[in-house]
From Swiss-Prot:
Compartments (UniProt record): Cell inner membrane
Name this protein carries in UniProt: Na(+)/H(+) antiporter NhaA
Biological role: Na(+)/H(+) antiporter that extrudes sodium in exchange for external protons.
Domain of life assignment: Bacteria
Length: 383
């Protein structure tokens, strides 16, 4: 990771945090009525009977986040072909650690929340916000070796793959087979353009991907799946910086960290304290998310990394201390944007959403703070 990219990750993390803080301030000020317009102003896209009519909040969650998952898909494709995921030995331990880091928070959430009305939120504390995590890693600088950062990114990649699967399987509320079939045809068209006709023009995949996204929204399946599958269809050529996948990933990166994720954070993090008492911190859904992110994530990930290192099944881990592995396990509990995203898919009740936002913010802050403390002040020999 070059110096300029480190600076981008650091600045991006600070902007993301500022956007979330601004949302809370605005939604608890005289400007709150303007903030509410995110859910009252509708925008239409389409012609005649082929129209998508959604409010600004939905456009951010269905549109901008689809672009974010397109970017995630491009990153994953590159890592599979030429990166860390191209070697099976580098895949097994981070994949199992990511799964444990998904399962443990979900189990903690379900152990606290028994009401059928809130069980649907089990996946909220299972996510990791890679943008925030990379921002803290950039802040730590040389205190975190490059290989350790690579391990965090690899775990986060598997976390993202799991999040996409969870959203597609568990948070699809209705299904139009016709629209889904049409979306699949556009995906197949991209595969044909790539594999058979060897078309390298990015614009072709942008247009076909847009129609795949449009049909996916109409089908009822969440649009993030269209973004991810589109990325997998875009040509990637090894040692060719101008291949469509490389070009699009490089082009999207600044938009993701400086615009898309901050806008999402601003739109979704606006906790309104009006009518909320301190007791909301102790509601089961809030506690389930806090303990899931802060305890479940670190417990699931660190237990796998430490055990596999002890058994010598994790060669990369032999160069790290247990404290370093524990520190990054803590950082993986920063759920923030991804947890908020799953939360707004799971519920639409205002009180529940406020409880979710508080739980996500508290759990993420605890994870980020203590992860930073461990890696910055407690680890004695970072190299």
């Amino acid at each position: 990771m070059g110096a300029s990219q480190k600076n981008q990750e650091l600045i991006g993390g600070l902007i993301l945090f500022s956007a979330a803080l601004l949302a809370i301030v605005v939604n608890n000020s005289p400007l709150a009525s303007y903030y509410a317009m995110l859910e009252t102003i509708n925008v239409k896209l389409g012609i005649e009977n082929l129209v998508i009519d959604k409010n600004l909040m939905h456009w951010i969650n269905d549109g901008l986040m689809a672009i974010y998952f397109l970017y995630i898909g491009l990153e994953i494709k590159r890592e599979i072909i030429v990166g860390t995921l191209s070697k099976p030995s580098n895949i097994i331990t981070p994949a199992i650690a990511a799964f444990a880091g998904l399962a443990m928070p979900s189990l903690i959430y379900l152990s606290i929340n028994h009401d059928i009305k809130v069980i649907n939120g089990w996946a909220i504390p299972s996510a990791t916000d890679i943008a925030f995590t990379l921002g803290i890693l950039a802040l730590l600088g040389t205190r975190v070796p490059a290989k350790l950062k690579l391990l965090v990114i690899t775990i986060a990649i598997f976390d993202d793959i799991a999040a996409i699967a969870i959203i597609a399987i568990f948070y699809t509320k209705s299904l139009s087979l016709l629209s889904l079939s049409l979306g699949t045809l556009f995906i197949l068209a991209m595969i044909i353009c790539n594999r058979i006709f060897k078309i390298n023009r990015s614009s072709v995949y942008v247009v076909l991907g847009f129609f795949a996204w449009f049909c996916t929204i109409k089908s009822g399946v969440h649009a993030t799946l269209a973004g991810f599958t589109t990325a997998l269809c875009i040509p990637f050529r090894e040692n060719d910086k101008d291949s469509p996948a490389n070009f699009m990933e490089d082009s999207l990166h600044p938009w993701i960290i400086y615009f898309i994720l901050p806008v999402f954070a601003f739109a979704n993090a606006g906790i309104s304290f009006s009518g909320i008492s301190f007791s909301i911190l102790f509601e089961p859904i809030t506690l389930g998310i806090i303990w899931g992110l802060f305890v479940g994530k670190q417990l699931g990930i660190f237990s796998i990394l430490a055990v596999f290192k002890k058994l010598k099944w994790f060669k990369l881990g032999e160069s790290f201390s247990n404290l370093q592995l524990y520190g990054i396990s803590l950082l993986c509990g920063i759920g923030f944007t991804m947890s908020l995203f799953i939360g707004v898919l799971a519920f639409n009740d205002t009180h529940l959403l406020n409880a979710i936002k508080i739980g996500v913010v508290v759990g993420s802050v605890l994870s980020g703070f203590f992860g930073y403390i461990v890696l910055r002040f407690i680890v004695t020999n970072p190299s």
